[in-house]
């Protein structure tokens, strides 16, 4: 699967390439945004949240990718197992599997001539930031890390409600069916729950030498905004910083007409 779409007007040099990356168990659908007029572009890996997909809610990652290209930065966004265009069974989704998929995407970027392998950053949204943090334990060359509404607690953290309500079902069936108001039911494997319980992403934050930007909304009811401050407090880079967006929820109001903070968040990110 290699489809290329021209998204610029400058001689057709700004491109979005739909690709499939092999992780040896299934393929990872991805969109690689880059500009052919540049050599060795800095690149950002975009990690979506639980039950979401590579474009993210309200097409946040689509808009971010476009804005990044405008300033000469490539990006890659992709679907975890069973999400978006992924053909893998949804029960294949596990937290450690997401970390491995992200590492596979990083390794793919390092094979691309257009990518400056010494200037790859990563951005995670919600649980995608937790994936990012866990990855930082093993992929130290990442130059910078950005958390959007990140949930990077060690262990269960903000997923306690799901553990209380659905873990027994996962024990009995091998997976739990979790109702979602904005999509069909989410199927999460027992392994997903066990991985969340047993992993320590904040340790990745503590070990990571690069700068971290943590952005959160002050009206986030899923991941309280003070956790963004905890992320930065655990960073050892003095350039790390936290930005709290006023009057903003977990998804930066992107689905609320006339109240979206998405553009503000993207500008802060850039």
Report the location of each language-model feature:
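N-terminal cap/lid segment of alpha/beta-hydrolase-fold proteins
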Residues: 3-42, 261
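Short beta-to-alpha linker loops that shape the active-site pocket of alpha/beta-hydrolase fold enzymes
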Residues: 50, 79-89, 151, 248-249, ...
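Active-site glycine-rich loops that stabilize anionic/oxyanionic intermediates
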Residues: 41, 48-53
């Amino acid at each position: 699967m290699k489809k290329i779409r021209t998204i610029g007007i400058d001689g057709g040099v700004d491109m979005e390439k739909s690709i499939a990356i092999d992780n040896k168990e299934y393929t990872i659908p991805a969109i690689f945004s880059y500009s052919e007029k540049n050599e060795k572009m800095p690149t950002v890996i975009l990690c979506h949240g639980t039950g979401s997909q590579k474009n993210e809610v309200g097409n946040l990652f689509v808009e971010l990718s476009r804005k990044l290209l405008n300033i000469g930065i490539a990006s890659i966004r992709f679907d975890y197992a069973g999400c978006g265009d992924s053909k893998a069974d949804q029960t294949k989704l596990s937290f450690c599997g997401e970390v491995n998929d992200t590492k596979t995407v990083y390794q793919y970027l390092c094979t691309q001539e257009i990518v400056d392998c010494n200037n790859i950053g990563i951005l995670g949204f919600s649980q995608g930031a937790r994936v990012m943090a866990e990855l930082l334990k093993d992929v130290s060359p990442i130059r910078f890390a950005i958390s959007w509404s990140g949930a990077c607690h060690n262990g269960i953290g903000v997923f306690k409600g799901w553990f209380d309500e659905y873990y027994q079902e996962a024990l009995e069936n091998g997976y739990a069916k979790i109702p979602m108001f904005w999509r069909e039911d989410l199927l999460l494997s027992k392994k997903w729950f066990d991985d969340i319980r047993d992993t320590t992403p904040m340790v990745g934050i503590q070990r990571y030498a690069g700068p971290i930007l943590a952005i959160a909304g002050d009206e986030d009811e899923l991941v309280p905004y003070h956790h963004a401050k905890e992320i930065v407090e655990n960073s050892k880079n003095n350039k790390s910083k936290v930005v709290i967006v006023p009057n903003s929820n977990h998804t930066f109001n992107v689905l609320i007409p006339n109240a979206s903070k998405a553009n503000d968040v993207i500008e802060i990110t850039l």
